[in-house]
Amino acid sequence: FNDNQKEQIKLGLKNGIDISIYAKPVFNYKEMEQIRLGLEKKLDVSIYAKAEFTQYQMEQIRLGLEEGVDVSIYAKSDFSSAKMEEIRIGLEHKIDVSIYANNNFNSAQMEEIRKALIVGKNVFLVANKEFNWQQMKQIRLGILQQLDISLYTNKKFNWQQMEQIRLGLKKNLDISIYANPKFNYNQMEQIR
């Protein structure tokens, strides 16, 4: 064990916890720390005290256990810690994470879908894996602003073009003049 690992073992002994669960060379000191923190809070660390998880994944699982959410939904090594975080936050808000708790979306896309779900908006317009997270954000913002998003939910528009169309709709402008993929976002902004 290196000095950092030894320090985690000492802290565990000092706090009267069973260090045998994490005093293993397979865990780096940050992973040991996540397991120790869970043990100190009397959590079932067996869910994440596994070499297949990184320290960051372990942290997301530990935080979910602390909040009492069903971590089995995301305690899977094929989810990055960032994806785990989006699923955990969704569970904490008591939303149906099944819409985005899969590897079809990256963590930024998951965040946009989660934000739409939290405010109770029609997430199926946002949860389209053909859109990147920035496009999803423009769609979500349009829904929140009660705009006719059908005028720009087209994968031919990049997110910056979508933003220019959304901003025009927000100001009740005639966007038909510039809502065309042939105009780049700078041109759209000038016309708007």
Give the predicted meaning of each segment.
Residues 1-192:
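General marker for long, soluble alpha-helical cores
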